[in-house]
């Protein structure tokens, strides 16, 4: 399973290509990964602009101009890649987001997930913290808000292995 630093690296990688790009369409070759893919996802983001790319925990969030956010989770074996529009599709390329860069160049964001434990969904950006997968997440492991005092408070009454507490 991609760990948090790998998800952050993926987020930074796609951000270089996707920021301010226009989504042309979204294609899915399967109807479900971990869960059923919403059937309207194919149409809902056509001709929207990508305003921001974020990450909460292991979820990559693609905020768009239609006030909705695409939510991606890489699952156990998933990864993202950016290719030219005329790329050769591989067997496990399950989600393809066709987009136009600000330079006018057409590219694709490919979500490849061999084991199909990944996830794609969308939710209102203003209400994102209430999404069923995001609402119970704790403080982000890479957050600058984690201070010594906070960790001291958490660990002061624990008598278990430190790795278990951190995870």
Model-derived features: positions:
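Extended, highly charged segments
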Residues: 1-68, 88-89, 96-101
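Phosphate/anion-contacting hairpin/loop surfaces
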Residues: 70-167
């Amino acid at each position: 399973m991609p760990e948090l630093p790998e998800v952050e690296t993926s987020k930074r990688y796609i951000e270089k290509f996707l920021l301010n790009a226009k989504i042309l369409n979204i294609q899915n070759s399967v109807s479900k990964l971990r869960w059923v893919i919403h059937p309207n996802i194919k149409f809902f983001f056509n001709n929207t602009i990508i305003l921001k790319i974020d990450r909460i925990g292991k979820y990559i969030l693609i905020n768009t101009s239609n006030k909705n956010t695409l939510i991606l989770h890489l699952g156990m074996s998933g990864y993202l890649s950016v290719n030219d529009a005329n790329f050769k599709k591989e067997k496990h390329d399950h989600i393809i987001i066709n987009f136009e860069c600000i330079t006018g160049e057409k590219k694709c964001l490919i979500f490849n997930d061999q084991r199909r434990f990944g996830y794609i969904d969308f939710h209102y950006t203003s209400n994102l913290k209430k999404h069923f997968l995001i609402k119970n997440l704790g403080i982000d492991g890479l957050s600058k808000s984690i201070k010594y005092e906070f960790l001291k408070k958490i660990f002061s009454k624990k008598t278990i292995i430190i790795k278990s507490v951190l995870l």
